[in-house]
From Swiss-Prot:
Protein name: Uncharacterized skeletal organic matrix protein 3
Tissue expression pattern: Component of the acid-insoluble and acid-soluble organic matrix of the aragonitic skeleton (at protein level).
Organism: Acropora millepora (Staghorn coral)
Keyword annotations of the record: Membrane, Signal, Transmembrane, Transmembrane helix
Taxonomic path: Eukaryota, Metazoa, Cnidaria, Anthozoa, Hexacorallia
Region (Disordered): 235-266, 320-340, 413-433
Amino acid sequence: MKICGLEKFRVFLSLISMVSLLCNGVNGFTIVRSMAVNGESVPDRFSNPSCRPSDCALKRASTTNGCSTTRDCCSCQCSKTRATYLTSPFNRCTTSEYIDEDCSSFFVLPDDSPPPVADITKPGHINFFSETRCHKGLRTRSWSHSVDATSWTTGKPNGFSVELVEGSSSSWKWRLSWQNGMDAKFSGLIIKLEFSCQNTRSGCFLMKSKGNYTIPNSEQWPSIIPTDVSFNLTGENANPTANSGTSARSNRNEQNKMEEPARNQAELEPKKTGVVVAGVTVSLAAGFVLALATLLLMKKKQTSLAVNAKARPNSYLGYEEPVDSAGRPEQTATESPSFDNEFYTTDCVLSLSGNNVGGKVTRMGPLPPLPGEESIYAEPMIKRSVAYQGLAEKNKQQDAGTACNVQPQPECKVIEKTSNENSHDKGTDEDKG
């Protein structure tokens, strides 16, 4: 099966995503604050790196809702009475008294009622109640966010507004609104809104932002001891206020300090286990990615070799004699090997008609080429130097090349005169006389 480049890219992205999720699941710590369809708040859920039910119980999570719907207990859920999960120094599910202890009694929540959950990433509003009415001039002075309800960071911009809906002598209903959605980075945090009034009264209101908040590593944030001092936000001197339950909260803080070493020791073991699991998981994922990359490279190389082999010409095939099927239907064309011999040609092969005992066509080897037209043999002419005895001594000293060019002297013949010639000669003599 050929894997295209796009499929390789998708497989690679899937592997990277899987490794990232595994690493985040082990090294990260996630807090989920959610709400039901009808708008009611749902107890917080948080990740459990060790995936053991005993660790959920250690963090004061509900025994019935302590684990998620999966078989492994990798997600714990707080109970309704302890619906809010706080990080260090608590690191467990807590009640409302641990959250609103920094707020004065001007705006309060019902007893044992957790802070409401609101989605601040889009425009909306939420209603809350107070025991005291600000007659006029109530405004949202500032707002801040936190993950542990002890260290607060001022949030910007301030897009919250508050107005009175209705009230009576004992309870007043307010509406908190925000026209623009906030940044998604504030999801999963605890939001504190601080109000001021013209009659020098001040107070705050707490709510939880809907969404997930993930701590990048397994190390919890440093412990910050909460204070029992309430601040007057009207600009006057900040003095401690006699809030109800202050002494009881101080005792609980002291008790938490004493229980902190034991909790840290109990939480140290799952952290070590999580680090080991993270190392093994990353190693296995890296090995799997390496094996897959090697397999893909080998597959690509084999495909390239196959394509090159198909493109290469078949030079090893020999001469195949054409067969006339009409003249000799009983014979079939067979391949003959090529002969690499300087005295023969590869295109001249003798094929005998008829089959041998084995039923195969009888063939002979290549024939020598036919002789061409031969020329008539002519004996070469040999020129020799001949010396004649009658030559002068100086002719004998000439070289062989000059002697070859000497022509023999012509022979002299004596011709006898006839009778006619004699009479003619006599007449001539007489005339002369």
